[in-house]
Amino acid sequence: MSLFAMSIRSLRKQLRQSRFFSRLYYAFGLDALPVLLQFPSYRRSQDKAIDKYASEDQLNKKKAIKRDMRKCYYQIKANPSEYFLMGLDTMSRKERAEFLTDKYMYMTMGKLIPRRVHDEEIENKVNFYNLAKDFFGRKVCCVECDADYDAFKHLALDVHDLIVKPNFAAMGSGIFAVSIDNEADARKVFEIIRGGGRGKWIIEERIKQSKEMAALNESSCNTVRYLSFLNKSGFFAITPFLRTGRKGSVVDNAGAGGIFANVDVKTGVVYTNGIDELGNEYECHPDSGIRFKGWQIPRYDEMVSTVRKMHRELMPSHPYIGWDMALTEKGWVVIECNWGQFINQYADHIGRKKEFLRYVYGK
């Protein structure tokens, strides 16, 4: 990366540190600089998306497709993958304007919540646990240095089955499950976690999900992503989605090979087929055989009540939060929260920008 590009990157970081400069940053269009300064990288992402998602006909029209991708970026900030997964490649300019892309969502939220606040309160898993521990429903410890071994050993020998997460893990990256039966195993796992001696980790008792949720896929903790909004008019939500992993996987993220399906916000009933990160569609879960459409999220009203309580008590200054919720035999617990992606648009190809803006700004 050139010195000029590094300087711009530093400037972008500084501008995001405060609410005032965040607004200036987006008002002057500095968010478009990465595409201009890192154009080779953007072109590679175009090629990767085309190879991954394009039809045979589209492969013969690469130049036109790339040109259209750039139009989508400048219109709604769509990245190359979103171009295909949202179905933007077949839409008019007017239809595309209805869709909420990741970048546009982060731009909007960046004007309301400084990025440092987002990173400290949401992305930092240890900080979030300290804030929301009453809603975790499981035992947890944090590992940052060698002095944390005793706490880790105590947890490991108490519950045996653990989920280990890097403090800033995203899309399931770096997360693994481990079973520990004795102190020797605890020491080995701790040394693996400590690795080079850097970084925080959060160690959680593995969730024992309810029988109904486990039926979808037993190896992963299957969850519901609930998108909640809090403004002066009250509490609202936009199309939640069910997330389930594949056989043998411990995570349910679409980015890690999982499958998701949209859920009716009022009834808790799944109303779309399942979709994976490649855009493949499934009437039934490929491993368990359970049909997605018509599947009822168990104890759905309890989950909504729990999310409402968390948002009002824990994050009252955040207009929008995406909550990952898991169901145990004792009730709903929170896995984590984030601003997340509106991948529900991939499943039904219905844009949710207007709805998002209405709830975020309380209009």
Question: Model segments located where?
Answer:
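Conserved N-proximal alpha/beta basic substrate-recognition cap immediately N-terminal to
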Residues: 27-157, 170
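Acidic carboxylate-rich catalytic motifs and surrounding loops in phosphoryl-/glycosyl-chemistry enzymes
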Residues: 142-146, 242, 321-324
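Active-site nucleotide/adenylate-binding loops and adjacent lid/helix of ATP-dependent enzymes
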Residues: 114-224, 232
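ATP-dependent carboxylate/phosphate-activation module, predominantly the ATP-grasp catalytic core
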Residues: 217, 221-305
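Short, flexible loop/turn elements at secondary-structure junctions
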Residues: 168, 182, 205-207, 228-230, ...
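Intrinsically disordered, low-structural-confidence terminal and linker regions
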Residues: 1-36
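C-terminal active-site "lid" helix and adjoining low-complexity regulatory extension at the edge
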Residues: 280-320, 327-363
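Protein kinase-like catalytic core scaffold
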Residues: 162, 236, 333-335
